[in-house]
Curated annotation (Swiss-Prot):
This is Acetylglutamate kinase. One of its GO terms (biological process) is L-arginine biosynthetic process. CDD domains: AAK_NAGK-C (cd04250). Substrate binds at G62, G63, R84, N188. The record marks K27, K251 as: Transition state stabilizer. Its main location: cytoplasm. Belongs to the acetylglutamate kinase family. ArgB subfamily. It comes from Methanosarcina mazei (strain ATCC BAA-159 / DSM 3647 / Goe1 / Go1 / JCM 11833 / OCM 88). Pathway: Amino-acid biosynthesis; L-arginine biosynthesis; N(2)-acetyl-L-ornithine from L-glutamate: step 2/4. Catalyzes the ATP-dependent phosphorylation of N-acetyl-L-glutamate. Gene3D superfamilies: Acetylglutamate kinase-like. One of its GO terms (molecular function) is ATP binding.
């Protein structure tokens, strides 16, 4: 039975009161931005959060767009354990897509819907300092093999001062997941990981990871198998069982880092479902997976 509109608003009130003046880091994944309408709906919801007194920070991905751009340029996208293998050319393509296209588009939409957006990368103000990940040693057909995933980084230090300044002035920061190392090299860092690290550095109340599935599914082919709550202690077992796999691994690990570092809750939700973020935040039932 559908709730009356006034009941929905009353149900939302205690959550709005609880979250007032709190910071929420929202990762908008490329897979959640499969159409212009979905993107607009997500940004409208984020601007609404700002208007009800919440301080949102956006970290965006762009995986499908990067892959599409690579294919148009005749280059095959390759992945290892959910991370994009990033050689010099792929790094340049990623910067072109993330900074020149997606970031500016999100900032523009925020302005269109009455908010104040400002774009950043991790190397602006040395916000995200990192290092290149070491080569991976894995068994392939019983033979130990070294896999170099290129300019894929891990963050070492998050400098959130500029974000605090922007939030206090009413801006919505929009961050591309590109870091810088000690030598000034750009690093491609998984956006879920960046979002978790930034949420921890900002002491955010919530980390919200938006993707194209309705949270963590016990059976990826069955939307009804959603796991609504995951404890930190259960994550390793779920990875061993294969329930958490592929691109969901960095999402869950990013969420776990954030929660272990003091973020109260992390949520994985389906951004392609209309207003799913508002339903997750402001209703009793929720629509995604909560990590705590």
């Amino acid at each position: 039975m559908e709730l009356k509109r006034e009941n929905v608003l009353i149900e939302a009130l205690p959550y709005m009161q609880e979250f007032y003046d709190s910071i929420m880091v929202i990762k908008v994944g490329g897979n959640a931005m499969v159409s212009a309408q979905i993107m607009e709906d997500i940004i409208k919801d984020i601007v609404l959060l700002r208007y009800v007194g919440i301080k949102p920070v956006i970290v965006h991905g762009g995986g499908p767009e990067i892959t599409e751009k690579m294919e148009r340029m005749g280059k095959k996208a390759e992945f290892f354990q959910g991370l994009r293998i990033t050689d010099d050319e792929t790094m340049e393509i990623a910067r072109m897509v993330l900074v020149g296209n997606i970031n500016t588009k999100i900032v523009s939409l925020i302005g269109l819907f009455g908010g104040k957006g400002v774009g950043f990368t991790g190397y602006d103000g040395r916000m995200i300092l990192g290092h290149k990940q070491a080569a991976k040693h894995v068994l392939i057909d019983g033979v130990e093999t070294e896999v170099d995933i290129g300019w894929v980084g891990e963050s070492e230090v998050i400098n959130p001062e500029i974000l605090h300044i922007m939030l206090e002035k009413g801006y919505i920061p929009v961050i591309s997941p590109i870091a810088v190392d000690a030598k000034g090299n750009a690093l491609n860092i998984n956006a879920d990981t960046v979002a978790g690290d930034i949420a921890a550095a900002l002491h955010a109340k919530k980390l919200i990871l938006m993707t194209d599935v309705s949270g963590l599914l016990r059976n990826i082919k069955d939307p009804g198998s959603r796991i609504s709550r995951v404890k930190l202690d259960d994550i390793d077992l779920l990875i061993e069982e294969g329930v958490i796999s592929g691109g969901m691994i960095p999402k869950i690990k990013g969420a776990a880092v954030a929660v272990k570092s003091g973020v109260e809750r992390a949520h994985i939700i389906n951004g392609s479902v209309s207003h799913s973020m508002l339903l997750e935040l402001f209703t009793d039932g929720g629509v995604g997976t909560m990590i705590y």
